[in-house]
A protein has these predicted regions:
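Alpha/beta enzyme core
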Residues: 2-40, 50-192, 201-230, 238-244
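Terminal helix/beta-alpha structural elements that buttress the NAD(P)+-binding lobe
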Residues: 195
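Short donor-sugar binding/catalytic loops of nucleotide-sugar-dependent glycosyltransferases
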Residues: 198
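N-terminal beta-loop-helix "entrance" segment that forms/cooperates
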Residues: 235
Length: 244
């Protein structure tokens, strides 16, 4: 797959993201405009929940999904707070919920808390796309990444996602490989999302090719594969413009 072909495909698989405390309604409106490119729209925008109404207005009839985050970024909020976050987001019009797995509890062996969290996500997000953020850079070990992936997949997660982008280590090729192989081996009807530190067409292309090699080319749709990034879109557009 040449870079231009990859860039065009990746636009439609992108969750164009801005999750910064300095975000404003104006900056989110601009993000929504950027998501609608001459080469097609991004799959989604991923924004803080307080800007969902702005995004709904800007993206009306575009087909672009609105994603937001809960239990973000530390993954250690009380379940009652997470439930309220979900309720607020869905009432505002979110289509997709990216929820941070309680990875600190997971590392401490508190698997019952993790199970309760996953049950809450499944129960509260019926009919919506859920993405469980494992924070693989903090899990570190392959065995932990696989175990956390399995917990999320067995709970019915729509996607398993690498990272919040707020820790020292974000998405890695190695973690993506483990997660994709876990989906394939268990024949789970769940997708994969890489996020955090993916800035260039070449960065994103390697995840696309990895997923293709493990899951097959037919699997590479927005229903199964996403990349979350903020600055990647500019590089994808530049790649297309340059023609190589």
């Amino acid at each position: 797959m040449d870079n231009v072909t990859a860039a065009k495909k990746l636009i439609g698989l992108l969750d164009l993201t801005s999750l910064n405390n300095k975000d404003t309604s104006y900056s989110v409106a601009e993000l929504c405009h950027r998501a609608q490119t001459p080469y097609g729209n991004t799959a989604a925008v991923c924004i803080l929940s307080r800007f969902i109404s702005t995004a709904k207005h800007e993206l009306a009839d575009s087909g672009i999904k609105i994603a937001t985050v809960v239990n973000f970024p530390q993954g250690n909020a009380e379940l009652s707070k997470v439930e309220k976050e979900i309720e607020t987001a869905l009432t505002a019009g979110a289509d997709e919920i990216d929820a941070v797995f309680p990875y600190q509890d997971f590392l401490a062996g508190n698997l019952n808390i993790c199970a309760d969290f996953l049950q809450l996500i499944g129960r509260s997000c019926l009919g919506k796309t859920t993405k469980i953020i494992l924070e693989t850079g903090e899990l570190k070990l392959a065995s932990r990444i696989q175990e956390a992936s399995l917990m999320a997949l067995m709970s019915g997660a729509g996607f398993i996602k690498t990272s919040t982008g707020k820790t020292k280590i974000s998405a890695t090729y190695e973690a993506a490989n483990i997660m994709l192989e876990t989906i394939r081996e268990g024949k789970y009807q769940s997708g994969f999302k890489a996020s955090g530190g993916i800035k260039t067409t070449m960065d994103a292309k390697q995840y696309l090719l990895l997923a293709k090699s493990i899951m097959g080319s037919d699997w590479l749709s927005p229903q199964n594969f996403r990349i979350g990034a903020s600055s990647l879109l500019d590089d994808l557009l530049q790649t297309i413009k340059q023609g190589y």
